[in-house]
A protein has these predicted regions:
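Hydrophobic transmembrane alpha-helices and immediately adjacent juxtamembrane helices
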Residues: 1-142, 146-258
C-alpha cells in the first residue's frame, strides 16, 4: 500500500472514530436534540401561532419546522467537532492523534465530515418526526440540500476552531452560551424578520445564521426574507473564511502542540 493510501486510510479511521463516538451515545446525541426540537414545536406553535406574522398561506407550525431542523443541525454539527477536541485536550489523549502522519488538512476533513454526518442525521430525523404533525411542502429540494450541507460544514468548522481555542470545559460552555446560542435564536428560527422593527431587521442581516436558516426555509416554501442567492453567497463566504482560519490554526499547532 502506498504512503498516500495509508494516509487517507488514516483519515477514514479518524472519521470513523468520530462517528462511532457520537453514535455509541445516540440517546444523548440524537434522541435528545430531536425531543428538544419537538418541545419547541409544540410550545411555540401553540403560543405564537396567532401572534407572529409569517409568509402568506403558510401556517406558523409549517413555518417553524425548517427553522427547528436547521437550528438542531447547526448546534449538533458544532457540538460534535468542538466536544471531540476539548475532551481530547482535557483528557490528554490528543497527543495520540497528533503523532499520526495525518496532515492538518486530513485532520480537518475527518473531524468536519463526522460533524456534518451528525448534524445532517439529526436534522433528517427531526424532519421525519415533524411529518406526523404537519404536511410540509418541498418546493426546491436543491436549496434544502445545499444549505443543509453548507450549514453543517460551517458550524462543524466553527466547532473545530472553538475546540482548538478552549482549554477547559467552562470556556467551551461560555462559547456555546454567549456566541452560538444567541446567534441561533436571533436568526429567524421562530419568526420572519419582516415582523421585526426596521432597526432589528437590519441587525438580523448581519447574522450569518439568519442566511442559513432563511435559505433552507426557502427550499420548503419558495419564499424567504431575502434572495436565496444572497444567502448562498454569504454562507459560502463565511464558510471559506472560517475554513481558512481553522486550517491556519491547525497548521501552526495553536494550542495543540506544545
Amino acid at each position: 500500500m502506498s504512503l498516500m493510501n495509508q494516509k487517507w486510510r488514516g483519515t477514514y479511521t479518524l472519521f470513523k472514530k468520530e462517528v462511532l463516538r457520537f453514535w455509541r451515545v445516540a440517546f444523548q446525541t440524537v434522541a435528545s436534540p430531536v425531543l428538544t426540537a419537538l418541545l419547541y414545536l409544540l410550545i411555540f406553535s401553540h403560543v405564537l401561532a396567532s401572534h407572529v406574522q409569517v409568509y402568506e398561506n403558510v401556517p406558523y407550525t409549517a413555518f417553524l419546522i425548517p427553522g427547528l431542523i436547521m437550528m438542531s443541525l447547526l448546534q449538533n454539527a458544532f457540538a460534535n467537532s468542538s466536544s471531540s477536541l476539548i475532551q481530547s485536550k482535557v483528557m490528554g489523549n490528543i497527543v495520540f492523534i497528533l503523532l499520526t502522519p495525518l496532515s492538518y488538512l486530513q485532520f480537518y476533513m475527518a473531524l468536519l465530515a463526522a460533524a456534518m454526518i451528525r448534524g445532517l442525521f439529526v436534522g433528517f430525523v427531526i424532519y421525519l418526526v415533524a411529518l406526523f404533525f404537519v404536511d410540509l411542502p418541498i418546493v426546491h429540494v436543491g436549496w434544502i440540500l445545499t444549505f443543509a450541507v453548507l450549514g453543517s460544514a460551517l458550524l462543524g468548522t466553527f466547532g473545530i476552531i472553538a475546540g482548538i481555542w478552549a482549554d477547559k470545559f467552562d470556556q467551551m460552555a461560555a462559547f456555546q452560551n454567549f456566541v452560538i446560542m444567541p446567534l441561533t435564536f436571533l436568526s429567524g428560527v421562530f419568526y420572519s424578520i419582516h415582523s421585526l422593527p426596521p432597526f432589528w431587521q437590519v441587525v438580523s442581516k448581519f447574522n450569518p445564521f439568519f442566511y442559513m436558516i432563511d435559505g433552507f426555509r426557502f427550499g420548503f416554501f419558495g419564499k424567504g426574507d431575502v434572495s436565496p442567492w444572497l444567502s448562498l453567497v454569504v454562507v459560502i463566504g463565511f464558510l471559506l473564511g472560517l475554513a481558512w482560519v481553522c486550517l491556519k490554526m491547525l497548521k501552526s499547532g495553536y494550542k495543540l502542540r506544545g
